[in-house]
Amino acid sequence: MSDNSQKKVIVGMSGGVDSSVSAYLLKEQGYQVVGLFMKNWEEDDDTEYCSASADLADAQAVCDKLGIELHTINFAAEYWDNVFEHFLSEYKAGRTPNPDILCNKEIKFKAFLEYAAEDLGADYIATGHYVRRRDIDGKSQLLRGVDNNKDQSYFLYTLSHQQIAQSLFPVGEMEKPEVRKIAEKLDLATAKKKDSTGICFIGERKFTDFLSRYLPAKPGPIVTVDGETIGEHQGLMYHTLGQRKGLGIGGTKEGSEDPWYVVDKDVANNILIVAQGHEHPRLMSVGLIAQQLHWVAREPITEAFRCTVKTRYRQADIPCTVTPLDEDKIEVRFDYPVAAVTPGQSAVFYQDEVCLGGGIIETRIQE
């Protein structure tokens, strides 16, 4: 076994069970382990939305129990400039961004990685992500986590092989119940804490309430694919393709009780377009165009190849053919039609267990 005692690892302690167990596992492997708690969001009200102080207290309790020190760092300014402003501008343009992917790219594996290496003298950083790393021919590949239910490689496709080489993912080799069991055995403060859901800076609060603070709502008509106005939306930004809940419309006068789904957004005219049935042709795509490409451990593609793709987190892999259009744009053709392919979201590509990389969905291709 290699001697890790000279290697210093800074663990991103979120106050959750995964990072807690990651710190423990690394300590068991002999590394010098130090915790770092990142504050990425400044609350502007006194409500209970943000649990940052509770998370910090949990992280501190875990570090005390494990006998490691905990540093704190405030990245709120970097987060606002590099993640949140982009998030707002995408919503304004009628797209649906994924801020967690940008947060990993700009904060956790950039600002945090740089701070850990330069200010804290780290050899590695570690996080509680459910992914694995494999080193081949001097390059680090990103692999799916062993726990298929929890695999988070979708959120990390923007990392370079250099960033992956400086990162450790201790729980990536484990199933989630196993991780909880370790935390319970050690009696860690986070052992029974539920997994955080939703976007990091919104927490558990209602998305529409949060967004309306930053972007003025602009109501407009809800129109069927046949051109009939059947309701009013409170703002296109509150809706995403494939959405069913929160439309406030019942069956049609013809009597069909099939639920309504958002099938398109006409941003120029502020119209929300809906249809009945989750397999309506307007909801289905046969492919997509992606841009802002990033390949983890391979050169940019020059010819078509076969792989699988996910167009959203926790979706089953879709077999597809990827064809380069130019240096930063590809066409992806699915083997079968796929519902709710959403511009602004990420398309992430896989070859078996290896995450190849991905890009931002620019447009969807329909029959």
UniProtKB/Swiss-Prot annotation:
Species classification: Bacteria, Pseudomonadati, Pseudomonadota, Gammaproteobacteria, Enterobacterales
Similarity field: Belongs to the MnmA/TRMU family.
Coiled coil start-end: none
Record localization: Cytoplasm
Enzyme class: transferase
Residue span of region Interaction with tRNA: 150-152, 312-313
Gene that specifies this protein: mnmA
Active-site residues from the entry: 103, 200
Chain residues that bind ATP: 12-19, 38, 128
Entry-linked NCBIfam families: PRK00143.1 (NF001138), trmU (TIGR00420)
Keywords associated with the record: ATP-binding, Cytoplasm, Disulfide bond, Nucleotide-binding, RNA-binding, Transferase, tRNA processing, tRNA-binding
Gene3D superfamilies: Adenine nucleotide alpha hydrolases-like domains (2.30.30.280), HUPs (3.40.50.620), Translation factors (2.40.30.10)
GO molecular function, one term: tRNA binding
Gene Ontology terms describing biological process: tRNA wobble position uridine thiolation
HAMAP family xrefs: tRNA_thiouridyl_MnmA (MF_00144)
Disulphides: 103-200
Site feature (Interaction with tRNA) residues: 129, 345
Entry's EC annotation: 2.8.1.13
Protein name: tRNA-specific 2-thiouridylase MnmA
CDD domains xrefs: MnmA_TRMU-like (cd01998)
Region span, Interaction with target base in tRNA: 98-100
InterPro entries: MnmA-like, MnmA-like_C, MnmA-like_central, MnmA-like_central_sf, Rossmann-like_a/b/a_fold
Reaction(s) catalysed by this chain's protein: S-sulfanyl-L-cysteinyl-[protein] + uridine(34) in tRNA + AH2 + ATP = 2-thiouridine(34) in tRNA + L-cysteinyl-[protein] + A + AMP + diphosphate + H(+)
Highest taxon above the source species: Bacteria
Job of this protein: Catalyzes the 2-thiolation of uridine at the wobble position (U34) of tRNA(Lys), tRNA(Glu) and tRNA(Gln), leading to the formation of s(2)U34, the first step of tRNA-mnm(5)s(2)U34 synthesis. Sulfur is provided by IscS, via a sulfur-relay system. Binds ATP and its substrate tRNAs.
